[in-house]
Regions:
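Left-handed beta-helix
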Residues: 1-157
Length: 157
């Protein structure tokens, strides 16, 4: 039973570090100690990744991101340019904004937890613009789309 955050954290790190025998990391080893699931969108030459790292399927990693292991990134995540993740666990559908730096953190939903179990409600702390749900349409993107549609409509005959 893994009932406490520090225990869960250590269990994931132990798997990534190869300390637990007969447990294999899913995906393909794309670099020594770096495993990726299906359809990971990344230019491997334009990111800085030091294993052990697992990147879940359908995750998007923008140029300039940095990942230092042991780190697990769940499926369908999005790391923006300049985001840094070290010694952390990022659960599915998490979006890390540009220049966000996470060290020794677990991120899931609107919560960020350190390895002692202390949590931060990102929405209540007004930090939800830094770490969000990757499935959400961001207001800035929506604003850009609105401007593009307005430009198209204004040039139509």
């Amino acid at each position: 039973d893994i009932g406490k955050v520090p225990d869960y954290w250590r269990a994931i790190q132990s798997v990534l570090l190869g300390e637990i025998k007969n447990v294999s990391i899913p995906g393909i080893e794309v670099r020594p100690g770096v495993y990726a699931g299906l359809n990971v969108a990344v230019n491997w030459d334009k990111v800085d990744i030091t294993g052990p790292v697992y990147i879940g399927a359908m995750t998007k990693i923008e140029d300039g991101a940095k990942i230092v292991g042991p780190t697990m990134i769940g499926p369908n995540c999005w790391l923006c340019s300049g985001a840094t993740v070290e010694n952390s666990v990022i659960f599915e559908y998490s979006r890390l904004g540009p220049e966000v730096r996470l060290v020794d953190k677990l991120v899931f939903g609107r919560y960020c937890v350190d390895k002692t179990g202390a949590s931060i409600d990102l929405q209540a702390a007004a930090l939800d613009w830094l770490i969000t749900d990757a499935r959400q349409v961001l207001p800035s993107v929506l604003g850009e789309e609105r401007r593009a549609i307005a430009d198209i409509l204004s040039t139509a005959d």
